[in-house]
From Swiss-Prot:
Active-site residue numbers: 112 (pros-phosphohistidine intermediate)
Protein purpose: Involved in the synthesis of nucleoside triphosphates other than ATP. The ATP gamma phosphate is transferred to the NDP beta phosphate via a ping-pong mechanism, using a phosphorylated active-site intermediate.
Gene Ontology MF: a single term: nucleoside diphosphate kinase activity
Name this protein carries in UniProt: Probable nucleoside diphosphate kinase 5
Transmembrane segments: none
UniProt entry tagged with the keyword Methyltransferase: no
Amino acid sequence: MIKPDGVSGNYTEEIKTIVVEAGFNIVKEMLTQLDKETASAFYEEHSSRSFFPHLVTYMTSGPVLVMVLEKRNAVSDWRDLIGPTDAEKAKISHPHSIRALCGKNSQKNCVHGSDSTSSAEREIKFFFKDVVSGDIATQQHDEL
């Protein structure tokens, strides 16, 4: 997912180019504006954390581009491509990562990345109801 700062900062096409050049296929994409209820549900696992209200406010501050990416080892390769959560640290340790390119800090870090294959499956289904479990589980690659 390209977060509001990535979309409003006009990084969308640049990020998509990086994604494709890294060997991913963009299977589905959807530009959407999250409301408070949707953002809260998507990030529900963080609801008890102190940063949760700020996260929901940020994620509803502008449109996001949700993508389904496909590639063998997609989740781990995507995590490598986006870099560390904190964009300031990414600029030092992973200067060619997406977060180093367009992120500002640990929240405004331009992109979201699933942390596991099971999270990827849940997150894909959250936004793309037409994707069924077998579509993901039986593929010869991961999707996120």
